[in-house]
């Protein structure tokens, strides 16, 4: 059997700490294609787990940011210190998702869309994966918000102003999120998911562990501190705000924020990133796919000859 010399071979064991741009795209398509092989219940479980991780770290970020939202400190530094701490804590969610192989809808908008564009999965299969990941993320985030964040009373309102800063921080974030216009929210969501999808791309491109952690951390930190809109994080934050506050309504949460955020996140991954990458590197993937087909044909022929020789000996 001849060894392939194609430059598009995905080599998991290499002295290189990062992939070439062509190999990164190939890995992205293969990653998206691989999601279609899971059964519905497995996909749902992976998506619920990702939603829980977002909830866990959004809870921790809310507490950390709230501690710096103390009213006397806020008089001097405003929200800047709380935003810094919030953004510094939240990226842990994405590291948890990556390490456990959980399924996040926003990352799928890039990976699964590239697999669709390369015709490695059909439209119905694409919609199945995307819908299950979104529903699972929603279940995980809302369940954590209700059973842990709301159930523990960590964000409950306190009549004592000196002890109400954690509730006030979450409440102010929620009010700000539902104050955007529909178009503003879409634009902020596009900015957010560009960073999130790039974080996924970094994971597929960088082989060095510490480099991977730093690249993912700063990509997610950038969107968190910039005030961008992330659909799964917002599902947790705004549903928790609905549970503990009367300052926002169901209509504001779902139609003024979550709907435009969903649209903007999808535009970022599925259009802004997936289409240009497909246009630039599609021929690289075709070469890789063709090479794999030829290799599989050689393997099958070799196995056929070996079986034929064995039968002749018998």
Curated annotation (Swiss-Prot):
Domain of life assignment: Eukaryota
InterPro entries linked: Aquaporin-like, For/NO2_transpt, For/NO2_transpt_CS
Topology, Extracellular side: 69-77, 150-185, 233-260
UniProt GO cellular component terms: plasma membrane; vacuolar membrane
Cytoplasmic side: 1-47, 99-128, 207-211, 282-314
Signal peptide: none
Higher taxonomy: Eukaryota, Sar, Alveolata, Apicomplexa, Aconoidasida
Function according to Swiss-Prot or TrEMBL: Monocarboxylate-proton symporter that mediates the efflux of the waste product lactate in the intraerythrocytic parasites; active in acidic-to-neutral pH range. Transports L-lactate.
Organism of this sequence: Plasmodium malariae
Family: Belongs to the FNT transporter (TC 1.A.16) family.
Keyword Cell membrane: yes
Catalysis performed (reactions): (S)-lactate(in) + H(+)(in) = (S)-lactate(out) + H(+)(out); formate(in) + H(+)(in) = formate(out) + H(+)(out); pyruvate(out) + H(+)(out) = pyruvate(in) + H(+)(in); acetate(out) + H(+)(out) = acetate(in) + H(+)(in)
Molecular-function annotations in GO: high-affinity secondary active nitrite transmembrane transporter activity
Protein name: Formate-nitrite transporter
Primary localisation category: membrane
Activity regulation text: Inhibited by the Malaria Box compound MMV007839 and its derivatives BH296 and BH267.meta.
One of the protein's GO biological processes: nitrite transport
Transmembrane domains' residue ranges: 48-68, 78-98, 129-149, 186-206, 212-232, 261-281
Membrane topology value: Multi-pass membrane protein
Cell compartment(s), UniProt: Cell membrane; Vacuole membrane
Gene3D superfamilies according to UniProt: Glycerol uptake facilitator protein (1.20.1080.10)
Assembly notes: Homopentamer.
Coiled coil: none
Keywords: Cell membrane, Membrane, Transmembrane, Transmembrane helix, Transport, Vacuole
């Amino acid at each position: 059997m001849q060894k392939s010399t194609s430059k598009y071979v995905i080599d998991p064991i290499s002295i290189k700490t990062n992939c070439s741009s062509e190999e990164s795209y190939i890995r992205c398509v293969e990653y998206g294609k691989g999601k279609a092989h899971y059964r519905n219940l497995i996909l749902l479980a992976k998506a619920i787990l990702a939603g829980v991780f977002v909830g866990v770290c959004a809870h921790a970020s809310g507490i950390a940011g709230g501690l710096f939202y103390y009213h006397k400190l806020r008089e001097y530094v405003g929200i800047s210190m709380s935003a810094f701490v919030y953004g510094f804590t939240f990226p842990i969610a994405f590291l948890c998702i990556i390490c456990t192989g959980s399924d996040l809808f926003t990352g799928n908008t890039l990976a699964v869309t590239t697999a669709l564009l390369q015709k490695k999965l059909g439209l119905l299969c694409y919609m199945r994966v995307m819908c299950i990941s979104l529903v699972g993320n929603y279940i995980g985030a809302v369940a954590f918000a209700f059973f842990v964040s709301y159930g523990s009373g960590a964000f409950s309102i306190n009549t004592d102003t000196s002890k109400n800063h954690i509730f006030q921080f979450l409440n102010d974030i929620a009010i700000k999120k539902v104050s955007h216009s529909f178009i503003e929210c879409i634009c902020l969501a596009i900015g957010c998911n560009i960073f999130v999808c790039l974080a996924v791309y970094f994971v597929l491109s960088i082989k060095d562990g510490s480099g991977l952690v730093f690249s993912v951390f700063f990509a997610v930190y950038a969107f968190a501190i910039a005030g961008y809109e992330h659909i799964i994080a917002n599902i947790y934050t705004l549903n928790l705000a609905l549970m503990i506050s009367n300052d926002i309504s169901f209509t504001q949460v779902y139609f003024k924020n979550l709907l435009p955020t969903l649209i903007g996140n999808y535009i970022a991954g599925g259009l802004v990133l997936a289409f240009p990458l497909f246009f630039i590197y599609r021929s690289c993937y075709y070469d890789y796919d063709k090479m794999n087909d030829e290799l599989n044909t050689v393997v099958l022929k070799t196995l056929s000859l070996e079986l034929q020789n064995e039968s002749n000996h018998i």
